Amino acid sequence: MDLNKLLSYSVDSGASDLHLSVGSIPMVRINGTMKPLNMEILKQEDMESILPQVLDEDQMNLFEENKEIDFSASLEGKGRFRVNFFNQIKGMAGVFRTIPEVVKDFDDLGIPPVLKNLALIDRGLVLLTGPT
């Protein structure tokens, strides 16, 4: 399985996440909605073929030991990803969260002026939170 093609599609389609899981069709999350890709259901062998594409030997050993690993990966010309691989009942699974190359400003995010002013306060602790 060519992970680079999957990640390229994910970025090009504007997806925030690429979800891979044994027993399921690969899916992307676009604007909060999970959308299946036009692919076959993933087998354990498919997932195992992905690991060497993104993990070095030390990371592979760590994953085998802990059955879970968090790391970052990059795809030249496309961007960076926060990655979590883990084991579940059906087998291995992984999620690639796209890290935007350009951080959006307040206007692009549609943040109201009152929240913008709060975020720019230079003393104290102000938390602006939302979905991840």
Question: Which residue ranges define each predicted feature?
Answer:
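The conserved Walker
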Residues: 131-132
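N-terminal "pre-motor" subdomain/linker immediately upstream of P-loop NTPase catalytic cores
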Residues: 1-118, 122-127
